Amino acid sequence: MHERNLIHRDLKPENIMLGLGPNSNIVHLIDFGLTRSVIDSKTGQHLPFVKNKNLIGTCRYVSINAHLGYEMSRRDDMLTLGNVMLYLFKGYLPWQSLSINKNSARFKALGEAKKWHYDNDLFDGCPPVFR
């Protein structure tokens, strides 16, 4: 996907499928509704970095950059995939229990919680591959 200059922008367990039988080692992505190109179709150039973007994707998994309002990139897909893998390994993410009703306040609180856990204890109990 990234080799084709596309970013998914909504990676989550529900959008990741495993092949069957002899193809059980193949991972398939689904739901490309938020996918976009990182290349401008008119100029052929990489899209510029932009701030103050609305959060796109599933809050539980998106990168801290998405919470900060930065344009999402391949890097954010990879960080989001890391959050998904942590969720699958641990069975939870430390920030998923936050319950704030107002979306803008919740997005901000989730971003702050993610930053704190990344800086402190997020990888506790995880194999070295997560570090």
Question: What label would you give each PLM region?
Answer:
Residues 2, 13, 58, 63, ...:
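Eukaryote-specific detector of the first structured module of a protein
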Residues 2-20:
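Catalytic-loop of the protein kinase fold
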Residues 12, 33, 65, 79:
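Anionic group-transfer/hydrolysis microenvironments
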Residues 19-56:
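Activation segment/activation loop of eukaryotic-type protein kinase catalytic domains
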Residues 21, 66-123:
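Conserved C-lobe activation region of Hanks-type protein kinase-like domains
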Residues 43-45, 55-70:
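Protein kinase subdomain VIII
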Residues 125-131:
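Conserved C-terminal C-lobe helix
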